[in-house]
């Protein structure tokens, strides 16, 4: 999904995070999201709290990319707000047209680390890398590509340690292209997973 798509999973849908949370687990999503944010495609105000985010899907905490590393906006979202938001440099995002005066990989290859971006990955330039989509602003909130893993992974142990103090934990970690579910595999967890699978079967009535 593009970085400006509304949240694909709707708040009224029953999620795996809902299932674990109802069983007393603390839940968190860390890393790549790629399933949309906000309640209107192209209508997100990245300078304010998003009206629809992972807190509406059963997650107690989230620290995520709005989409993926190759798409704008190139910022992390923490609990529905841009992390390290810089009010002196407001964020604007578009997947239809560029902003006046902003360089792109297609028109300004001399500004890139890689002088030959692929078609589609030749739009706004952030950190010397051209992306899918157009954006301007961001300031201190923009991630550093070489530090993405180091920026995300510290939240994993802190989330787990905080959760263990109160209950078990479900944490979804997506550093790039993979998803890892982290929790103790006990009989109760196995039962929860089977219950969730049943809610997703074609003959299921949902909650």
Model-derived regions, located:
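Formylglycine-dependent sulfatase
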Residues: 1-207
